[in-house]
């Protein structure tokens, strides 16, 4: 069983599932001021906030086209959060646009809008534009926030995501995940067999690109903390090597090569170290730390057991990992020197692919029991364990930067006669708001980036 689990972890381990913690901060819709009042949400359910996103004022056709595109992305971002319910523009009563005037709040109240977004776009030179937007509290008739961004025309989509993040932050009190990216392994079929390539895309599936050519088998890609590099394992002539791909320059180089099987590379939070799992002896796997500044390699685990799937805590002082030292596959926590090892899970079943939340309060995992796979979260003291995703073969959770959303992969067959499909899904930490993230082909091993500036 342990051998099978090791193989599974080298294939689809560390996939990204998105976790929403039980608490959201929502706007007190009957407040008389713009003070935000936190509301406790349980079971991932809350009344969605009706929001009207007015078309941004524009003069030229070029500006008008950008206005429509940006508003569409903002609306889509806020809608998939399940916190907001964008109101159709067909219902808008007031037609005046822009940020200079005071809205006719009674007109927006009539269509039940709690929040109103007004904006305008201006071309400032041959390549750049300026967008300004205002977030209004309709009930109190007060301005919540006003911001501007300058951007080149080709970056209109990321600018829209930034605006959505700002709206989410100022209304809910929490940061959003809209201006982020996802890296994963794409798998397609050819006459020569399966082609596995590392792909990268925006969190909504747009701007999809491949960063490897499919000549070599690849697994477990992850972003560097600054989002500039992708760390992954590539098998050339069946020999595994840890490689790093620079997203800015396109340079791709070998970072480390071990005897045996190497997998599950992970960056430290400061980006100066990486952890890898290496199996050079049958049924024995250890975790190693590679210092990227000095090149020194340090073995962190000892003994004759399998130790794999390391995941740093947000401050880098602790490491969650998987081991079979107790006779079953469980999750443990140790310090960054390999000491003070404590067992986190102890219930029936195998626990794999630990992923430490960026908010430092949960560890996500894959559980395998009686042939059934599930995704769950558990507190750092081993309490409050809950399963948040099941059905078919689900694996490899990865956190969004807000610490509330998890991405993961699910393998399934639509019918017994059809081929297996592997797709990406996100879900909040309560197990609600699950949605498929569209990809062109089969997808596994997802990892969520940090927020882009």
Curated annotation (Swiss-Prot):
Coiled coil: none annotated. Keywords: Cell cycle, Cell division, Periplasm, Signal. Gene3D superfamilies: TolB, C-terminal domain (2.120.10.30), TolB, N-terminal domain (3.40.50.10070). This is Tol-Pal system protein TolB. It is found in: Periplasm. GO terms for cellular component: periplasmic space. One of its GO terms (biological process) is cell division. Residues 1-31 form the signal peptide. Transmembrane segments: none annotated. Belongs to the TolB family. InterPro entries: 6-blade_b-propeller_TolB-like, PD40, Tol-Pal_TolB, TolB_N. The Tol-Pal system is composed of five core proteins: the inner membrane proteins TolA, TolQ and TolR, the periplasmic protein TolB and the outer membrane protein Pal. They form a network linking the inner and outer membranes and the peptidoglycan layer. Its main location: periplasm. Part of the Tol-Pal system, which plays a role in outer membrane invagination during cell division and is important for maintaining outer membrane integrity.
